[in-house]
Amino acid sequence: MGVSQLPTDNYWLSLAYYDLQTAEAMLQSKRYLYVGFRCHQTIEKALKAIYAQNNNEVPPKIHNLARLLKLVELEDDIPHDLFNVIHELNPLNVASRYPDEDLAI
């Protein structure tokens, strides 16, 4: 993929915004498991937007929010409450796809 074909940070941010709107719609319809998953996706794509902007390259194909925070060097700069929310959402990426992985949800 040539540099002109790289997804931009705007691309990732528009996907993140779409996921946020989807999470809000699911919250209104009480689809709570999927709200968590979409919130995870929102944060993941927002972090990938930061990565794309900072590195001028396609973000890695990972879904671990804690790892993405480290890659964009924000883990020490975000408010403690947001840091905790990100760590609470992190397992929902797997749990919503494979419900038997964590029956406590």
Language-model-derived ranges and their functions:
Residues 1-105:
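Terminal alpha-helical segments
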